[in-house]
């Protein structure tokens, strides 16, 4: 069977796929239909955070699958409640809403912020400030929140009520707060699709202070950098701020679709019965996977992330053909002299899977990738950058 032809015939043309059909994997290794082995540094775009077919994760998921796969949010289930407890205890947040994706987590964050602001200040205080170069999802509202025009074309009109601030410019943020009737400021502490660009610590702390002074909510989008990838449990923790709302997804359930919106003290009770919902959100199987993930993201695991990050930066900074390395933890962007797409293709030929963010290589390896496999992959990247 020609899988690629079948896909091209029946799947909507929304993806420019690489010419590879992946059929199986184990840990940080995957194999294509011809039996070729690859070291995977993309992990399904930061989803398979313990790699493919992780034994502990599979055991947790299959145990739940044999008990109850779905029942809806009309009933109580243990995995959903236990996962919410874990998230709150590990972050200091108060309540959780579960959806299925990062876009859904951000939609909930936006709804919660607007309802809080309307309840407290009035309906007109609905504007949410996001950052230029940001990415918050592909629904009409999260596209509106995304501060990149390239994603807006063909889908106008977008949801109203968003304005965009210059990253790392507190004066511009203060100006927008003064000029608009605002509910919240929403940011990724590391802009992923925007080129793996971490915000300055002084800016994030300054933004949090501006929110406090102006009675605005601070929303941190942790969809990609969250769940241990930064070397902390969540990326905002590296900046020493406490958001009012946190959105996360991708690696949360280790490979299953799950999004979460964490609500802090100010907004913990803003959503009441009927104000929001999800058919699949909090699915028991997905929650079982996420419980396994969170229970394993201990200090030793996070120190391992930091060590792997330091190794990659040490090896690639100053390497031939490498202009610079950006990012945090195991979410790294590599600026190269050669075209990034050409390097990605060359790496793939040599058995290493990497992806792009704007004009950079984007590295998103499993948090527990064996050091020998990581070293081999980085050697290939260096060779392809230099060649």
Where does each model-flagged region fall?
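Conserved N-terminal phosphate-binding loop of PLP-dependent enzymes in the Aspartate aminotransferase
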Residues: 1-387
